[in-house]
Amino acid sequence: MTEIRPKTPLTYAQLRTMAGQELGVSEWTTVDQNRIDQFAECTGDHQWIHVDRERARRQSPFRTTIAHGYLTLSIIGALALGMGIVPENTQAAFNYGFDKVRFLAPVKVGARIRLRTTLLSMEDRGPGQYLMKAANTVEIEGEKKPALMAETLVMLYERRKRAGA
C-alpha cells in the first residue's frame, strides 16, 4: 500500500470561502488481493468475484478478482485525511453520511486508485460545528472511467479555546 503523506491542513476560515473549489488529489494506493480478502473477512462478503482468483479468471467478465464497491468507498476516508482536508484545530470529525454514491467501474486486483475532492459546502451547525459536504471521485490509474463518485458529509467539531488560554 502506498504511504499517504499528510499535507498542511486548511483552516476553518479558508474552507468557508472555498465552495466549488478542488481541495486536492491524493497519493495513489494499490488495492491488492490481501486488502480485498481482509475486507471480505471483516464484512462476511466472500462472493467469489472478490476472493476466488481462479474462478474469477475463468468466469468473471473482468478475468480477475475485483474489489468490493464498499471497500473502495471506505478507502475515501483515509485518502482524504492524507490530503489534509480535515481543517487544523479540529477536535473531532465524524462521518455523517453519503449522497449520490455511484459505482461506475470495477477496481481490479492490483489496480492503483486515488481520490479527487471538491468542496461543495461548509454549513454552520452551531458554535464550532460544521457540516462539510464534498464531491469525491475515486480514479483508477490508466482508466478513463472512475471507480466511483460520491458526495461525503462529514460533521466537524472545532477545538474550542479554553478560558484564560
Task: Describe the role of every protein-language-model region.
Residues 1-18, 106-165:
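HotDog/MaoC-like acyl-thioester-processing domains
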Residues 2-67:
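Catalytic strand-loop segment that frames the active site of acyl-thioester-processing enzymes
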Residues 24, 28-30, 102, 153-155:
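Generic structural detector for well-ordered beta-strands
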Residues 27, 35, 45, 90-99, ...:
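A generic structural signal for short beta-strands and their flanking turns/coil linkers
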Residues 37-40, 73-77:
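Predominant activation on well-ordered alpha-helical scaffold segments within soluble catalytic domains
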Residues 60-67, 74, 78-116:
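Hydrophobic beta-strand-centered segment that forms part of the acyl-chain substrate-binding groove
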